[in-house]
From Swiss-Prot:
Lineage, opening ranks: Eukaryota, Metazoa, Ecdysozoa, Arthropoda, Crustacea
Chain positions recorded as a divalent metal cation 3 binding sites: C11, C16, C25, C27
Protein name, per record: Metallothionein-2
Function: Metallothioneins have a high content of cysteine residues that bind various heavy metals. Class I MTS in marine crustacea are involved in the sequestration of elevated levels of heavy-metal ions.
Organism listed in the record: Scylla serrata (Mud crab)
A molecular function (GO) term: metal ion binding
Residues annotated to bind a divalent metal cation 6: C39, C45, C49, C56
């Protein structure tokens, strides 16, 4: 089985903790986009940018 993160996920920088694999691991939505993301709003930014901020869903 995949290491840890099966029932409880520890999110870090938008992904599961190092060494963990978990499809349900999601961090809180970003508050704002980074300078590298040219989107109208944070919803579009989350959809189109690979990693607009420190913690993305």
């Amino acid at each position: 089985p995949d290491p840890c993160c099966n029932d409880k996920c520890d999110c870090k920088e938008g992904e599961c903790k190092t060494g963990c694999k978990c499809t349900s691991c999601r961090c809180p939505p970003c508050e704002q986009c980074s300078s590298g993301c040219k989107c109208a709003n944070k919803e579009d930014c989350r959809k189109t940018c690979s990693k607009p901020c420190s913690c993305c869903p």
